[in-house]
Design a protein with these regions (language model features):
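Feature responds to low-complexity, polar/acidic, surface-exposed segments characteristic
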Residues: 1-13, 17-45, 54-74, 81-123, ...
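Short nucleic-acid-contacting surface segments enriched for D/E, G, S/T with interspersed K/R
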Residues: 212
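Surface-exposed binding/hinge segments that line
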Residues: 127, 131-132
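Short aromatic-glycine-enriched beta-strand elements
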Residues: 192-198
């Protein structure tokens, strides 16, 4: 796994494609037209073009994506905010203040949980990327809602953060997470078996057995 190794921008695009698509082959997106000049033929082309098609990435602003460049924490956070549904133009992820606005929303979304000392411009390591991605898939997605003004006929859109139970883990992988409290531990010397009782607000009490 090489946890201390650096993550490239192409690798980040691949990981985001997986949390969005599951097992769907991103090669289907190789035909997507973009204004990026340095990705055709790259191993990550399909993943990059998928992310581009979803508004998750937009390149460097000079027509390039720099797929082999290391990704920084704030760049990864911007991609992940797009993955959970935020709109870059609405949230101010473009222009001179983009990094400030990305950092604000990433912190509010809990992307930096358990990542002490991570600074915006630090090159992201593989273990940091794994933690940030886990934090992103475990937070509520953002839903785009149309609002129609019957008087003017104008449609505007609002972006609303959903509860943490409505997240990418559930939407992509049909996985639900819950926090539990260990309330009781028992040991049977006859069976050489531990029984743990866990409790949470959703499922009540659950017992788990473990053989010593």
């Amino acid at each position: 796994f090489a946890p201390a190794g650096n993550v490239t921008r192409a690798e980040m695009a691949k990981m985001i494609s997986i949390i969005m698509l599951g097992n769907v082959d991103a090669d289907a997106f190789k035909g997507t037209i973009t204004d990026l000049t340095d990705i055709n033929g790259h191993w990550g082309e399909g993943f990059i073009k998928y992310c581009y098609s979803q508004g998750i990435i937009a390149g460097r602003g000079d027509g390039t994506f720099a797929p082999n460049a290391n990704v920084t924490a704030v760049e990864a956070a911007k991609m992940l905010l797009g993955a959970i549904g935020y709109n870059s133009d609405v949230q101010g992820y473009v222009g001179s203040d983009w990094a400030i606005n990305v950092t604000r929303d990433a912190q509010l979304s809990g992307f930096y949980a358990d990542l002490k000392g991570l600074t915006a411009n630090k090159t992201l390591t593989r273990d940091e990327a794994a933690q940030m991605i886990y934090n992103a898939v475990d937070t509520g997605i953002v839903k785009k809602t149309p609002n129609w003004n019957s008087s003017t006929g104008v449609v505007t859109y609002s972006y609303n953060k959903q509860p943490d139970t409505d997240d990418l883990l559930k939407n992509t992988f049909d996985v639900t997470t819950t926090e539990t409290t260990l309330t009781k531990t028992e040991y049977s010397s006859e069976k050489k078996e531990y029984t743990y009782t866990l409790a949470d607000a959703v499922n009540g009490s659950t017992t788990v057995k473990s053989t010593s």
